[in-house]
Amino acid sequence: MSEIKEVRNKIKCITNTQKITKAMEMVSISKMKKAEVKMNSGRPYLKTIKEIINNFISNNTRYQHVYLEQRAVKKIGIIIISTDRGLCGNLNVTLFKKILDFIQNYNNRNITSDLSILGLKGLSFFKSLSNKIVYFNDYAKNNYTFSDCLNCNSIFMKLYSIGEIDRLFLAYNKFKSTLIQIPSIIQLLPLSKKKIHCHNNHWDYIYESDSKLLLNKLLNNYLEFQIYQASLENYTSEQAARMIAMKQATDNSKDLIRELQIIYNKARQDNITQELTEIVSGAAAISLN
């Protein structure tokens, strides 16, 4: 009897957990769809502003800017975009592993790294390393918006401008589809001239103000929005990964409940058989008397 009660309690607990994972799956689906719309709406802007910068520099090849300077690398900066919450599979783990390999590659060349971290999971993982964390933002406590990119971006821009860091990278999970999120590390600074000069057709613009001031503004805006767009990509990836993880948990709980139900039915059947045997034995004993 105690075994039946124990199995029944297990089934009840797993059923309650199943309801939670199913609810989290549905919430993640809703959040992912909203995030995907927001993410996709930002891609055309990022592409257009990059094309404008490309065309400007292609037609002003003598123009020099600190963000275009190629210099010897002594220290790098990495902006890491992670999540605040778990229950999203191995999304953070695969990204962190890629970042660790990336940092180690530079450490082998005696090049140090400074980190800027967005998300609690990134902070809890990388704070144990010897790398200096120059900036941190908590999504949960601060509703992350484009204005937050100004803080994250401005710190490394100053460090890069004064020569404290020589390269700046951005690490995040790129959203490709619901089932595929790609851990990515891209170079923000210096801007690659090879990529800039890849266009076959170029045209120049008529500038109402100083063209150099305009380019400086465009470059800063491009870098800020690149970080913001990456945060949208990572957030969409998080919701997709959590949706899949919760779906797998729900499916696994169904299988576990099914197995426990078989054990419960067998135990109950054995118990009924034992009771019937006792009744029959008792009746036989009475009839003999």
UniProtKB/Swiss-Prot annotation:
GO terms for molecular function: ATP binding; proton-transporting ATP synthase activity, rotational mechanism. CDD domains: F1-ATPase_gamma (cd12151). InterPro entries: ATP_synth_F1_ATPase_gsu (IPR035968), ATP_synth_F1_gsu (IPR000131), ATP_synth_F1_gsu_CS (IPR023632). Produces ATP from ADP in the presence of a proton gradient across the membrane. The gamma chain is believed to be important in regulating ATPase activity and the flow of protons through the CF(0) complex. Its main location: membrane. F-type ATPases have 2 components, CF(1) - the catalytic core - and CF(0) - the membrane proton channel. CF(1) has five subunits: alpha(3), beta(3), gamma(1), delta(1), epsilon(1). CF(0) has three main subunits: a, b and c. The lineage of its organism: Bacteria, Pseudomonadati, Pseudomonadota, Gammaproteobacteria, Enterobacterales. It is a peripheral membrane protein. It comes from the Bacteria. NCBIfam families: ATPsyn_F1gamma (TIGR01146). It is found in: Cell membrane. PROSITE patterns: ATPASE_GAMMA. Keywords: ATP synthesis, Cell membrane, CF(1), Hydrogen ion transport, Ion transport, Membrane, Transport. This is ATP synthase gamma chain. One of its GO terms (cellular component) is plasma membrane. GO terms for biological process: proton motive force-driven plasma membrane ATP synthesis. Belongs to the ATPase gamma chain family.
